[in-house]
């Protein structure tokens, strides 16, 4: 049994996935977990692997959902993505980027490509 918060999160991820597929991305997997991190969606954009954080806010009058991705969350996303790349033996074999999709209660979607910069 899922909590209301989890159901809202799943719906936001489903909405984001459909939106991104309409934009030309291909679905690979969802909810990839490693230790304290989770990547909501992993998709491909032509030959690039895209790690996607989906954020939903019911009340976005004061802060947009995209702005809620903290530096700590960014570090966890990067560590989890590195684990994914190592697990699938893709490290140094494929280009990747980190995108954020923000969704508001009125279903407005904001997609920011390369939202998180990673230094190697």
From Swiss-Prot:
Pfam families reported for this sequence: UPF0102
Domain of life where this protein originates: Bacteria
InterPro entries linked to this entry: Restrct_endonuc-II-like, tRNA_endonuc-like_dom_sf, UPF0102_YraN-like
MF terms in GO: nucleic acid binding
Family: Belongs to the UPF0102 family.
PANTHER family reported for this sequence: UPF0102 PROTEIN YRAN
Protein's name according to its UniProt entry: UPF0102 protein CBUD_0259
